Amino acid sequence: CGADTFIRVGTCGGMQPEVKSGDIVIATGAIRMEGTSREYAPIEFPAVPDLTVTNALVDAAQKKGYPFHTGVVQCKDSFYGQHEPEAKPVGYELLNKWEAWKKLGCLASEMESAALFVGASCLKVRVGSCFLVLANQEREKLGLENPVVHDTDMAVQVAVEAVRNLIRTDGKKKE
């Protein structure tokens, strides 16, 4: 017994110009640029959330009328790796990967989802992730508005509404 469904609620940094501070990002997959998930599955195994949980998060964000984006997020170990990468010994690698992820449409950068998605696959449980965008350094580079937003209330509300939806749909399946 125990929990069978998990939702990670947190913060991220935007990577695409259309992803604004205060928006919600719902992950549909995570780039495994961290170390934890490699201890559970080969790097070729994708880090993806449960579709039912992800759809519940999308439905909740739509119901609340919050601005949101769905897509791939970058999951990394270093909180400040993307800030002034040229000052770091592996700056060339950080810069090249950051640019590649942007070109591939990666929406945001965060630190937990890949490990959670792979771990959930191993444990045969459901997981999803939603984030509040704190800021977006790419918008700043383009001279676009980029206020820093720390109020995670919208992301929490999306997760709570998603849990309500999952409880309802799971209950109907048992009937």
Name these PLM-found stretches.
Residues 1-175:
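Glycine-rich phosphate- or other oxyanion-binding loops that anchor nucleotides, phosphorylated ligands
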